[in-house]
């Protein structure tokens, strides 16, 4: 018999359940209804339990995703150098919007229990994984169960429990009007600057231009209690050591990338000098 799923009222109720030590009563696939300024009611689905480590020190977490995207929007608008939008998650309009008016649209008690987490996303411009700290984010291709091949699909996080079986039907979403919809992922198409991964109405992976339209299927992580002044928060710039180490490694890699062209030029010049000296020495030996 199929397990009956439960619908909870608000993120604050989930936080209370965690706080009371009753995490076991929550199940993957359960839904949560929240009030929001984008729509009277938004529906969220539990896709992971203790799958994400919160940067504020929260010991137990529940990861949820929006299953009735309320708006159709672009991933990133056109700008200088990227007339059709850019597929980089970190500077995208989508990420800024999620951390801005979308986050602000929750009731205060629900917003207070959303905790910051660290997310990995491939950067086509830098040709490597970059890390961001977000309270609201989009899911990645690997997190929804698309197989990683280190080419078209990069490792941007383990599949959440809800998507582990690879069932396309679980990726099918309907918008707030009840219509099947495309929805954005944060994963770029790795070989260009404008293509972003999307999931189609059939649940299959696809891609679209960053300036095009898609459903905003936000995700977030709920902690055990409201963030208070005595807890570490991302906003206070006190991220975990691992995150800081990643940032340092990223900065070093950026510096190396900047230096490499000059080093290559110096090596080429040195090779030409050696070649010229060798040629002159050979000429003198013949004399």
Question: Can you describe what each PLM-predicted range is?
Answer:
Residues 1-243:
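Collagenous Gly-X-Y triple-helix signature in extracellular proteins
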Residues 240-283:
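Short, low-complexity, charged amphipathic interaction modules
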């Amino acid at each position: 018999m199929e397990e009956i799923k439960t619908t909870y009222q608000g993120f604050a109720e989930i936080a209370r359940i965690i706080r009371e030590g009753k995490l076991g009563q929550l199940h993957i696939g359960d839904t949560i209804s929240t009030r929001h300024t984008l729509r009277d009611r938004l529906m969220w689905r539990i896709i992971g339990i203790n799958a994400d480590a919160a940067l504020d020190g929260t010991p137990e977490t529940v990861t949820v995703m929006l299953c009735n995207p309320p708006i159709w929007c672009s991933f990133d608008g056109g700008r200088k150098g990227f007339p059709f939008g850019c597929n980089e998650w970190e500077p995208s309009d989508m990420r800024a919007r999620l951390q801005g008016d979308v986050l602000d649209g929750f009731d205060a008690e629900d917003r207070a229990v959303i905790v910051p987490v660290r997310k990995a996303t491939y950067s086509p411009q830098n040709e490597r994984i970059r890390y961001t700290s977000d309270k609201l984010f989009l899911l990645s291709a690997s997190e929804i169960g698309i197989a990683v091949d280190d080419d078209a699909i990069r490792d941007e996080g383990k599949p959440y429990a809800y998507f582990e079986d690879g069932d396309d039907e679980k990726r099918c979403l309907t918008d707030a009007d009840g219509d099947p919809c495309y929805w954005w992922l944060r994963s770029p198409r790795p070989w260009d600057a404008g293509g972003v991964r999307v999931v189609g109405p059939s649940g299959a992976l696809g891609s679209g231009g960053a300036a095009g339209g898609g459903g905003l299927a936000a995700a977030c992580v709920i902690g055990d209690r409201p963030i208070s002044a005595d807890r570490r928060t991302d906003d206070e710039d006190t991220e975990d050591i691992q995150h800081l180490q990643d940032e340092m490694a990223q900065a070093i890699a950026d510096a190396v990338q900047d230096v490499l062209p000059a080093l290559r030029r110096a090596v080429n010049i040195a090779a030409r000098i050696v070649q010229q000296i060798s040629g002159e020495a050979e000429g003198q030996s013949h004399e």
